[in-house]
Each structure stands twice: as C-alpha cells, then as structure tokens.
A protein has these predicted regions:
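Conserved alpha/beta-hydrolase catalytic His-Asp/Glu region
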Residues: 112, 117-215
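Conserved hydrolase catalytic core segment
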Residues: 73-112
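Conserved acidic catalytic loop of the alpha/beta-hydrolase fold
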Residues: 58-75
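Conserved alpha/beta-hydrolase "acid-adjacent" motif
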Residues: 229-235
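Active-site acidic short loop of glycosyltransferases
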Residues: 6-8, 71-74, 95, 217-219
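Short beta-strand/loop motif that positions the catalytic acidic residue
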Residues: 216, 222-224, 228
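Conserved HGGG/HGGXW glycine-rich cap/lid loop of the alpha/beta-hydrolase fold
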Residues: 2-49
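Conserved alpha/beta-hydrolase "nucleophile elbow" surrounding the catalytic nucleophile
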Residues: 15-17, 75, 79-81, 225
Length: 235
C-alpha cells in the first residue's frame, strides 16, 4: 500500500472461487496510468489463514475491514465470478468509496451444478478440469521443455500417455500437451485447505441479496466473455 502512486489509478481485484492474489499478477495494464493491481486474499486463500468465513457476505466483510485498516478509498473495484458476488456485497455496504465497480463473467444468482459441487469436495483435480474446460477458450502458450525440466517435473515431457504429475498428485491423461498448458493455471486452485473450492462453490449457491441492497448497485459494469461456457449471457 505504501508503494501506491496516488497520481495513478488503483484497482482492487477479487478473484474467483478457489483462487487468490496470484490471478492479479496476470493483469497487464499501462504502468503510466495504473498502479499494480491489488488483491486481498480471502480467508483460506493464498497467504491468509483459514477462518470460519464461508459465505459471500463474510468474505465481503473481511475485505471491508481490511480496507478500513489500510485506509484505502477512491479506487476501482472488480471481481471475477465468485469475486463478482463479493464485489456486489461490498458495493452494497459502501458504494461511495469505489470509483467504479466491474463484474467479470459473473451473474446473480450464481448457480453451481451438482457435478461441480460434488467434484469440488471429492475430486479437486476433476473440478479444476471442469472449470478450465468450460471457462478457458484460448489455451495458454505451452512452455517448451528444456534440459532442466524445472518445477513442472520431467514426467510431463517423458510420457505421451499414462500417469503424470498434477498439482494434486498423479492421474491418467489422454492429452499431455493440454495438461502442460493448463498446469500453471490449475495450480491457482491449490490452497492450504483442499476444501476451500467447495466452500466457495457453496458460498456462491447460498448468496442472495435483499432488493433494497440490489437497488444500491447502480452504475456498475458487467462484462461477460462470449466464449465462457460457465456463464449464461441470457441471464
């Protein structure tokens, strides 16, 4: 916070379910106009220890308390998917401290399919597969293997089929190249507690707002990716 240049715009980004501040590092904004994107890890995400927080409202309250302690106001608030719901709750608490509010690939209510709910609690790798299959249109570029295979592990490059190392252990795959390309992205779901994605999914399912609070959410931006199959553009 001490490194913020007050002559430039400030953005606070709230990541989607199961993710943390590492997502904010993916933003590539004009450094002449914007500070580096800020992201506050929710309880149980990234560097923030787990707590009893398990609802969108509790997540929003956590960030609100952090903002008060940091004395951070007059900035742009944006969130992706579940993070968008957290932004809605935050904006209903105190809309005036935000210069703008933007929701990326988020809809309200945000329903989660039973297969994904079950997978997030029983098979984290399967849930990550589901989210990347339907939420990713353009595949990340694949890192070419070198003599030293690095943290990805040589198993990715030595085998064409069979067992490979994933962020959550070993599994059989049919498309090794896709697994390599998505490896860094899927690592974002790897938190201290493997239950956190399930907690987030249930938080999305349970989030509802009073009509009076919804009416406070005027002048917000909603951006839906045309190719994102996890969000319906009709709702």
């Amino acid at each position: 916070i001490d490194l913020i240049d007050k002559s430039k715009e400030v953005i606070l980004f709230v990541p989607g379910a199961g993710m943390d501040h590492r997502v904010a590092n993916l933003f590539d904004l004009n450094p002449k106009l914007f500070n580096k994107v800020i992201s506050i890890d929710l309880p149980g995400h990234g560097g923030t220890p787990p707590s009893n927080a398990s609802t969108i409202e509790e997540y929003a309250k956590f960030i609100s308390v952090c903002l008060e302690e940091l004395n951070l106001t007059d900035f742009h608030l944006c969130g992706h998917s579940m993070g968008g719901l957290v932004c809605m709750s935050l904006a209903s608490l105190n809309r005036k401290i935000f210069k703008s509010v933007s929701l990326f690939n988020c809809q309200y209510p945000l329903f989660v399919g039973s297969a994904l709910l079950d997978g997030s609690s029983r098979n984290l790798d399967g849930a990550a597969d589901f989210l990347t299959k339907y939420g990713i249109y353009k595949m990340p570029s694949i890192e070419k293997p070198k003599k030293a295979f690095g943290i990805k592990g040589s198993s990715f490059y030595k085998k064409t089929n069979g067992k490979v190392i994933t962020p959550y252990g070993f599994k059989d795959i049919d498309n090794p190249e896709r697994e390599i390309a998505l490896y860094d992205l899927k690592k974002l779901f790897n938190q201290v507690s493997k239950d956190i994605l399930a907690v987030d999914m249930n938080a999305c399912m349970g989030f509802r707002m009073d009509i009076k609070d919804i009416n406070k959410l005027n002048d917000i931006n909603i951006i839906i990716g045309e190719k994102d199959k996890l969000v319906s553009q009709k709702k």
